Design a protein with these regions (language model features):
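Conserved G1/Walker A P-loop phosphate-binding module
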Residues: 1-126, 142
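P-loop NTP-binding site
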Residues: 3-7, 12-14, 18-27, 36-40, ...
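Conserved catalytic network of the ASCE P-loop NTPase/AAA+ motor domain
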Residues: 84-89, 140-144, 175-179, 206
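Conserved nucleotide-binding/hydrolysis micro-motifs of P-loop NTPases
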Residues: 99-103, 154-157, 190-193, 218-221, ...
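Conserved ATPase-coupling elements of RecA-like P-loop NTPase cores
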Residues: 105-108, 159-164, 194-198
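Inter-motif core of Ras-like GTPase G domains
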Residues: 106-159, 175-176
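Charged helix-capping and loop-helix junction motifs
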Residues: 164-170
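Canonical P-loop GTPase G-domain recognition
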Residues: 171-184, 189-256
Length: 384
């Protein structure tokens, strides 16, 4: 998938507004990710030099260590950037930086061993810094962001151990799950290619059932950013599942045992998948004894539609033919003579059909000869 296709699909999914809420525990690299994202994607698309310079000045500060740098939610840039696509269409994009959820060992939320009190637009009185931070993060997720990026870490980007982040990480992901907005998890590491980073990413992916991408936010490349956005596309919900199967299955009378079995399996399968990632690159087991194989034939990431082909066992076709006709049909060899015989019987019936209809209507009917049954002879004079 090309970069432009990724952006087009996300724009169609979000109605043209890609507002990415960057959330997670404090001291994980959220501001660093936003700064790098803006440098790679947003700033190059701002044509006006003055606006580009102002947007660059609005980029968040970031630093190593345990001190919290972000003090309030902030839109980056303040005004959404309109990005025109060369293939047609456009979308508006901006990111939302959050303070995040507190973790043990972080500095900046207390003063003289007491909670630091701050004024917040969501309260009419001073509240503890951590309460204001969590409230702001929730509002960003619920009211402003169209998609989410959770930034967590293996503990290598700050002077805090991995276990200090686990509780805040779990809480923020639970918030996103409750809201139902698509999101992806970034595992910020100083060495994202290490075995330890990949093992932790696999563990988190198994725990949260979401895409987890190990990455170094400081050194993130444009290709890695495209990969993150593509993974995000697969976190959008499935809107439609179209199943292709032999047309004769749909021609059976409603309530037929084969239809009931196949449709029940389809409904059960549809209830077990929710987002595009649940289907992409995976086996599609439709639990039906009459379906021999299912193949994923197409996915439209922009609309959320999935196309599947279901193959029915060949012997089922002959079994149903036998049931419907009362004839002994078990394979192609037995089918051919039956079809030939039935065709002859149909031709014979077609000759007398109109007469039979007349009999039912009037009590008698006339069978007209076909053109092939007529013979022309020399006329004879008959005297009587």
């Amino acid at each position: 998938m090309t970069q432009e296709q990724i952006y087009q699909n996300i724009a169609r999914r979000t109605g043209g507004d890609i507002y990415i809420g960057v959330v997670g525990p404090v001291r994980t690299g959220k501001s660093t990710f936003i700064k790098r994202f803006s440098e790679l994607l947003l700033l190059p698309h701002i044509q006006n030099e003055a606006q580009r310079a102002r947007a660059n000045d609005e980029l968040p500060q970031s630093a190593a260590g345990r001190t919290i740098m972000t003090t309030e939610p902030k839109f980056i840039p303040e005004k959404a950037v309109n990005i025109e696509l060369s293939g047609g269409g456009s979308f508006r994009a901006r990111l939302i930086d959050c303070v995040g959820y507190m973790v043990d060992g972080a500095l900046g939320h207390e003063e003289q061993d007491a909670p630091r009190l701050v004024k917040s637009p969501w309260f009419d009185h001073e509240v503890p810094f951590d309460l204001a931070a969590e409230t702001g993060t929730r509002r960003v997720i619920r009211e402003h962001a169209t998609v989410g990026v959770v930034v967590t870490t293996d503990g290598s980007v700050a002077d805090l151990p991995r276990e200090n982040y686990c509780e805040a990480e779990r809480r923020i992901i639970a918030e996103l799950e409750a809201i139902g907005k698509p999101y992806v998890i970034l595992l910020n590491c100083t060495d994202p290619d290490s075995d330890a980073a990949h093992q932790l990413a696999a563990q988190l992916q198994d725990t949260y059932q979401r895409a987890v991408v190990p990455i170094n936010c400081v050194a993130m490349t444009a290709e890695e950013l495209d990969g993150i956005l593509q993974r995000l596309l697969y976190e959008f919900p499935i809107r439609e599942i179209a199943v292709q199967m032999p047309s004769w299955v749909m021609m059976l009378e409603p309530g037929h045992w084969l239809q009931s079995a196949v449709y029940t399996a389809m409904l059960k399968f549809a209830g077990s998948v929710h987002k595009m990632a649940d289907i992409a690159g995976k086996n599609l087991p439709l639990e039906c004894e009459y379906i021999t194989k299912t193949i994923l034939t197409g996915m439209d990431l922009a609309s959320g539609s999935v196309h599947i082909t279901a193959m029915i066992a060949p012997d089922i076709f002959y079994k149903i033919l036998g049931e419907q006709t009362g004839l002994s049909i078990v394979d192609e060899a037995s089918l051919l003579p039956c079809v030939v015989s039935l065709a002859k019987a149909k031709r014979a019936y077609d000759k007398i059909k109109s007469a039979l209809d007349q009999v039912e209507a009037t009590g008698y009917g006339i069978v007209m000869p076909g053109i092939e049954e007529l013979t022309l002879e020399v006329p004879e004079i008959v005297r009587q």
